[in-house]
Amino acid sequence: MWRGDESPFEGRNFQLPRPLNSPNAVQKPHPPILIGGGGEKKTLRLVAKYADACNLFDVPGVPLEQGIAHKLRVLRSHCEAEGRDYAEIEKAVTSFFQLGPDREAGLRNLVDHLRDLAAVGIDHAIVSPRGPYDDATLEALVSVLPELHAIETRTGSAAAAQ
């Protein structure tokens, strides 16, 4: 499909009489494959085998060492089992946050957390405020963008700059 081949596909779950991808993919040999999730037995094994990138979920209240850092160790072990270079997989995380009544303290905590994520090997972070989505929260995020870009510069990771 990504090569412009429209030959029929007959699979166990899907039958495609004329698979068509229009417009054709720009990236060669195919678009980057990102697999999201943190299942340790299947999902991270599939990441190690097939993906160009993964997106993990930063579960609120789970310490970094038991959460994201642990998932990255599991991914590394799957890469070793597959004979895959762990470093060639981009690691992303989706992190939900709430600034709380003390916005300044909430911002400090968020910046520190993103710095910690970069330090354990996260390349990209998607930060999502928990509702309500208001202009003040978004403006507060904008106010720390220079600091987040500085994390990227120091670590080589874009974890905090997304």
Which positions does each model-derived feature cover?
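Active-site-adjacent structural elements that line small-molecule/cofactor binding pockets in enzymes
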Residues: 1-162
